[in-house]
Regions:
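Short, acidic/polar
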Residues: 56-64, 115-126, 201-202
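Divalent metal-coordination and catalytic microenvironments
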Residues: 4, 35, 46, 67, ...
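Metal-associated gating/positioning segment near the N- to mid-region
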Residues: 36-101
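Histidine-rich, glycine-flanked metal-binding segment
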Residues: 1-41
């Protein structure tokens, strides 16, 4: 492609030269169009490839091929799987599927707690060499002390905590935000406080521990305000 705008991250010149030298162009076709931009591969830090356990929804093969088609060369997979990657043994099942089925780079998250049940910390130390971070995605960690200990261990291991924030006692069977749509059409709503209260708690723990933290989902203006003020 010629005349396109090239968007690039910083790259060591020696690496760039090596890549250029390795490209064979015996029958090169030139596509000339200044309307387009050329980017390096994208990375999606929150995907669900659903293997092991839920291959009827997605697989490493289908998920990675769809990612590559869309320009994503690296993704980070969430741990709400069966079995949950909460131990070296369970994580290895996922790593084997990644090795056999993925056409892109896949970096899994390990679970924060065993079975994502919020009762016992998972084997963070054992999984650390092969995960990008720790998350109980799909469920909020309800115990303040459990989340504090998770942050401290993650900090010692150099791995980020990635949180799905919900206070279970405030869900009350809801499955959609308790806003105008829910009130007009009848779905049972979830109050904004369910999300915001746990984000506020976690941000206080972040201040106490000084560690890296990411919220998976932000769905209310109240949550945005809490984060903005932190």
């Amino acid at each position: 492609m010629s005349n396109a705008k090239v968007i690039t991250a910083s790259l060591d010149q020696a690496v760039a030269d090596a890549i250029r030298a390795s490209i064979s162009t015996p029958e090169l076709s030139i596509f000339d169009d200044s309307r387009y931009s050329v980017f390096p591969g994208f990375c999606d830090v929150h995907v669900h490839f659903r293997e092991p356990g839920f291959s009827y929804k997605e697989t490493m093969v289908t998920g990675s091929q769809a990612s590559a088609r869309g320009g994503y060369t690296a993704v980070c997979t969430m741990p709400n799987l069966k079995p949950v990657p909460d131990s070296v043994e369970n994580l290895n099942q996922q790593l084997k599927l990644i090795e056999e089925g993925s056409c892109i780079h896949v970096y899994p998250y390990g679970a924060i707690t065993v079975g994502e049940q919020g009762e016992v910390l998972a084997d963070l130390e054992g999984m650390a060499p092969n995960v990008i971070g720790f998350s109980d995605d799909g469920k909020g960690v309800q115990s303040d002390e459990m989340m504090l200990q998770a942050m401290l261990r993650a900090k010692a291991l150099g791995k980020m905590i990635v949180a799905h924030c919900e206070v279970n006692d405030l869900l009350r069977g809801g499955y959609i935000h308790d806003g105008e749509y829910a009130r007009e059409h009848g779905p049972r709503g979830i109050c904004s406080e369910s999300e915001g209260a746990q984000i506020a708690r976690d941000l206080e723990l972040v201040k106490d521990t000084g560690w890296a933290y990411h919220v998976c989902h932000i769905s209310t203006k109240e949550s945005v305000d809490i984060i903005r003020k932190a």
